[in-house]
């Protein structure tokens, strides 16, 4: 009898300790944001999250408000779906939310949390951010690689020309746009072209496939990041998979560094990073350099291609908008030469189309997760230290309180309007926003403008283009875009000059 009493007492103490660890008294007394109610043991509210995270959280926000909380395993998560709350997070509380949660993916793909995207806020992150702003994404650096972008866009046009023939021909856009983005980034980074005529690299195909796998495994969708027990048993072999991906990516990146050391051309980003390594070898190790290259390839390969694919899908479903954009290009650029980057500031309607694509189909529907480094308040609610912040940009871009008819494609809504960053955030907001937004907008603008200028476009059949989205950190189309295109006279002229 006495031993049973001791056993029950022991179990009660253990359960109380676990309860206090998961749900501290100080937390329960706070004015936390609304929540879906009693969380299930161990998993919390994870059962409420569907395959498309942004849609699951949007549905919950309609019930619990634009600021609500979830208990995902043993982690408290703040979900923000309004411009006002996002602005408060990234202005008043910008430093508090400058940290990143230490998810499993960051350990392997992010070189043990040392990359600019995944590293904790601090001196190391500031060094990387400064390097990106001054050495990689400054106006001077981008202008230095202008010829690469224009050449790759021309190569895309020639590839489509060969695929379509003289009349309307069927083309699949996803792979071609991905190859363009990959080539642009790789030529800037390593001076190598991997896809296109007379170039076909199995190694690059493998690496691009690995990038796709990274985006599939990224975000806040891995249960093991929230439930330690699932990480201990390696739920669905997640950790084993990302470890294997990281090893293969690391080998590819190390080969790029090795080749640059041998060639010493001094014209690529790797060349520049290796010169920094010579002066500061203790800081710019191969691991740090590989992490920088990794971020450039991940950020530069998928997002621009996805955005152009969404934009073309929207235009094919709205041919009158496509025609209006073509008329603007012919008026501002003419019909005797290809569109150039220097033309983009004059093409306001094209810019409006891109902004509307960013709004309706953001490449990153959920911003990269943040984590609070201290207690703070958001919209009057208490947010404890260590809370994960998820900002639903997809929902903010469809907020009916700010956007008129938010589900409709209306580029005109952006005409002459200077939007606050909290209303349209395709590249994030605050000090950890994407530093490569300038490059992305140049690539997207030039590519989309050239496709409109050089081809007639039609849907395959009468049915509208399927606009369903797929899953992942970026938001791909569930069905890759296929369309009919026919070369216009301007492209015939370009082809004759090239041959």
UniProtKB/Swiss-Prot annotation:
The keyword tRNA processing does not apply. It is an enzyme of class 1 (oxidoreductase). The chain crosses the membrane at residues 5-25. Keywords: Glycoprotein, Heme, Iron, Membrane, Metal-binding, Monooxygenase, Oxidoreductase, Transmembrane, Transmembrane helix. It is a single-pass membrane protein. InterPro entries: Cyt_P450 (IPR001128), Cyt_P450_CS (IPR017972), Cyt_P450_E_grp-I (IPR002401), Cyt_P450_sf (IPR036396), Plant_Cytochrome_P450_Monoox (IPR050651). The keyword Ion transport does not apply. GO terms for molecular function: heme binding; iron ion binding; monooxygenase activity; oxidoreductase activity, acting on paired donors, with incorporation or reduction of molecular oxygen. Heme binds at residue 434. GO terms for cellular component: membrane. PANTHER family: CYTOCHROME P450 82C3-RELATED, CYTOCHROME P450, FAMILY 81, SUBFAMILY D, POLYPEPTIDE 5. Belongs to the cytochrome P450 family. This is Cytochrome P450 81Q32. It comes from Catharanthus roseus (Madagascar periwinkle).
